[in-house]
Structure formats: C-alpha cells, structure tokens
C-alpha cells in the first residue's frame, strides 16, 4: 500500500519539498516500488487514455448538440470545428481579390478597420446554396495570394460545479494598489456585489447588456477574490458572446483586442479556447507587438488534446489549473503552451443576480495570473511579456518535475493568501524589482 501511495504521489506531482522528505524511504524500498511502478504505470496510462476519450467524446457531443440546435447560424470546418455558417473572413484583401469574390457571388460586408492593431478584416457572405467549406475553397482558388479563413467559434474553458458554496475564500479584497486589466469573454453583471468598488468599462453588442455566468465569474476573480473586488481596479470588459449560446467568434475576439489596445490596456485575460485561426493569430501577434500581455486558459479537453488557441500562440501566457492540494486538474490541457499554473477548483465566484457559485476549470485559473501580471505591470509600465513571465515565474512554486514541464509550466503562482503574506514580508516587492530590472 505504501509503495502504491508513493507511485501515485509521484504521478500526481507532489511538491519537491514533500518528495525530498520521502527520499530515504524511497531508496530503502526501491526494488518494491519499481515493481509496483511497472504494474501501476500501465493502469495509469489506461486511465489517462480513458479520460482523454471521455473528454473528447463530451466535447464532440456538445458541439453536435450546438450544431443541431443552431444549424441556421453554425457550420463546421474540415476538422469539425464550429464556425459561423456562410461567413469567411478576408484579412487585408486587395481590391482585385474582392472583385473576384463579388463576381463569384460573394457579398462583402463593411470592412472592420482595427486601426489600433493595424488590421483590416472584411467579412464575406457565401452565395446561396454554398457551404462554408466550399466558400473557403472557392475564395482560395480565386485569390491564392489572399488570406481567407473561417470565422471560428471560441468558448469558455470551465464551468460551475455542483454543491453549495462553502467558505473557501476569505471575502477580503486582494492586496496592493489597484490595477488595470482587460477581459474578453461573455457579458459581466456590473451590478454584482462582488464587483462593487471596481471601475467597469464595457464594449460590444451594440451597447446591449447580456450578463452571463462565465463572464461574471471570471471578472470577479480578475478584480478580486471572487467575492470582493479590490477598490479602484479598472476592468475593461469586451463581451464577444452577446447572449448567444454558441460562444464568441474570431472576428469578435479580434475586435475586442483592438478596443482594449485603443484603451491602452496592457494586460488582457482570455478564458476562451478554440482552433487556430488566421485572423485571431494576426490580432494576437499585433497586440503583443504593441506591448500587450495576453493571458489565456489552456483549456479542459484533457492531457492528450491538441493545443488550443489563443493560449498556444507564441508569447501568450498559457495557464493551467490545479486543485487546492496542488494537483493538476485531470481535464486540463498539457504541452508547451502551459506556462504557469494557478488554483482553478473549489473557487467561489460571482454569478449573475448577486449569487455565488463554485467554479472549476482553467478559465478560472487564468484570471489569477492576469491579475498578478497587471499588478506587476503597474510597478513597471515598460515591461514586456517576457519580463512579466519571468517575474511571475520567480514567484511561482515549482511543481511536478524540476523546472518547466508540460503539466505545470514554470510552477504555481501564489494564491491571494500567499500574496498577502508575501506583501507583508516584502516578497511581492522583490518580484516587482525583478520586473524593473528585467531587460
């Protein structure tokens, strides 16, 4: 039993300090543990494979249900990712390219000029009777040098959990000076008590308000501890869902980034995931080139899932989630896109109507990292994403294998209680000084 516990502890990634305390016993029982490991490892591999299949099947089922319910507005690409039906995004098209598209029956909508990012996007509607896949193929044949892609959909990477709300958080606002931070998500309930004291500016949906569970929960963790906001925090919230159950689209996310760039918001949280997309990729790269720091959830599709975006784009800070015992969530994505970890389970967060609910997922770990990054940036406004990542990593506690790894990245960032203790002892100031001294 002890040997099995040791093997499982190693698999779950105990902190190095705990492993070091067990080292003499491990050496004494090495022959036994090695034998058990040979027996246990295949079982763990099969369990992980079963989990991956279950998560993949669940996501496929969710997508099929959405497609069945909203077939009038949804379609799929060649990899079965959900897209806006009949819509193709042309990135900086030439006049000749647009003329060819019109001649083939496409209708071009008003260009979206994202001047703050230096981008122009023209949505094109496919001719009647032509599928979205056929539309993409047609445009790429008509204009091989042009850039055309689907308008992919992006959804949250976490949700509510069952059970009543406990007392896991203190209800005390985060320490330190107020920070400025951006959010691209679903709608936020600005009247929620958990956001009282925060300064909220909103964008999207033609000014209409669509408070949503996911956006409100993420916002409450971005400006405070989920139950109370740090007074004076400025939250710039872009609603790219607008009440639609299908999620946000690539065009909306790009426009949200452009608005945040226009507002000179340097740190942005993106707790949404989806496939690679040419427009989103260019928008993310343009934002980063202009000094913005993007923090994104890595997703909950399981350890074997392909990297999800935008977290997998270069220089985006990808965040995974652990439980209160520092164990990575089984459903969390793994890979090179994982930069940091934060607690993302058994958290209390705000939901519309003045309510609170427990939440789980990488969606709710990412705002902890984004809030820390915003605080550090307030100390050194000229720091870039690499410098901030280095400062965050300096605060992080290494988990799993020594050094950066595909499960925990560079380690677990401090929780609010840890931050308060660090602030009182000078630890946070030390991290800020590392940002100031970064090249």
Predicted features and spans:
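Substrate-binding/access-modulating region of protease and related hydrolase catalytic domains
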Residues: 22-27, 241-313, 325-328, 354-360, ...
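Boundary of Sec targeting at the N-terminus
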Residues: 18-21, 164-165
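N-terminal signal peptide c-region/cleavage motif recognized by signal peptidases
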Residues: 12-17
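Protease zymogen maturation seam
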Residues: 116-123, 130-194, 407, 423, ...
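Hydrolase catalytic cores
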Residues: 240, 344-419
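Inhibitory N-terminal propeptides of secreted protease zymogens
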Residues: 22-150, 155-156, 266-267, 426, ...
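Catalytic-core environment of secreted peptidases
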Residues: 184, 188-201, 321-363
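Subtilisin-like serine protease catalytic core
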Residues: 171-180, 188-200, 207-251, 313-314, ...
């Amino acid at each position: 039993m002890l040997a099995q516990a040791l093997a499982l502890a190693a698999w779950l990634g105990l902190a190095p300090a705990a492993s070091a305390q067990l080292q003499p016993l491990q050496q004494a029982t090495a022959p036994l543990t090695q034998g058990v490991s040979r027996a246990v490892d295949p079982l763990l591999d099969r369990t992980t494979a079963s989990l991956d299949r279950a998560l993949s099947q669940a996501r496929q089922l969710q997508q099929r249900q959405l497609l069945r319910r909203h077939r009038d507005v949804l379609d799929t690409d060649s990899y079965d990712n959900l897209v806006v039906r009949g819509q193709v995004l042309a990135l900086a098209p030439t006049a000749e390219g647009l003329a060819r598209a019109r001649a083939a029956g496409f209708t071009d909508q008003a260009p979206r000029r994202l001047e703050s990012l230096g981008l122009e996007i023209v949505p094109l509607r496919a001719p009647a009777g032509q599928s979205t896949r056929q539309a993409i193929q047609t445009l790429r044949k008509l204009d091989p040098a042009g850039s055309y892609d689907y308008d992919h959909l992006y959804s949250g990477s976490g949700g509510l959990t069952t059970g009543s709300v406990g007392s896991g958080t203190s209800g005390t606002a985060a320490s330190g000076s107020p920070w400025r931070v951006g959010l691209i998500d679903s709608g936020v309930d600005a009247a929620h008590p958990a956001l009282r004291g925060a300064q909220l500016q909103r964008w999207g949906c033609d000014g209409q308000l669509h408070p949503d569970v996911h956006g409100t929960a993420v916002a409450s963790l971005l400006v405070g501890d989920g139950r109370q906001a740090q007074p004076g925090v400025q939250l710039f919230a872009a609603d790219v869902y607008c009440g639609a159950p299908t999620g946000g689209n690539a065009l909306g996310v790009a426009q949200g980034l452009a608005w945040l760039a226009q507002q000179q918001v340097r740190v942005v949280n993106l707790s949404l995931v989806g496939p690679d997309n040419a427009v989103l990729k260019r928008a993310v790269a343009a934002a980063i080139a202009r000094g913005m720091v993007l923090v994104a959830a890595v997703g909950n599709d399981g350890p074997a899932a392909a990297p999800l975006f935008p977290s997998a784009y270069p220089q985006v800070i990808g965040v995974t989630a652990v439980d209160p015992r520092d164990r990575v969530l089984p459903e969390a994505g793994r890979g090179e896109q994982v930069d940091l970890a934060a607690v993302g389970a058994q958290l209390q967060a705000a939901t519309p109507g003045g309510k609170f609910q427990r939440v789980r997922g990488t969606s709710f770990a990412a705002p902890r990292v984004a809030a820390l990054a915003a605080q550090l940036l307030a100390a050194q406004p000229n720091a870039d994403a690499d410098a901030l990542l280095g400062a965050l990593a300096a605060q992080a506690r290494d988990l799993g294998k020594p050094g950066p790894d595909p499960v925990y990245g560079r380690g677990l960032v401090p929780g609010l209680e840890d931050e308060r203790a660090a602030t009182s002892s000078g630890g946070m100031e030390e991290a800020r000084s590392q940002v100031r001294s970064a090249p």
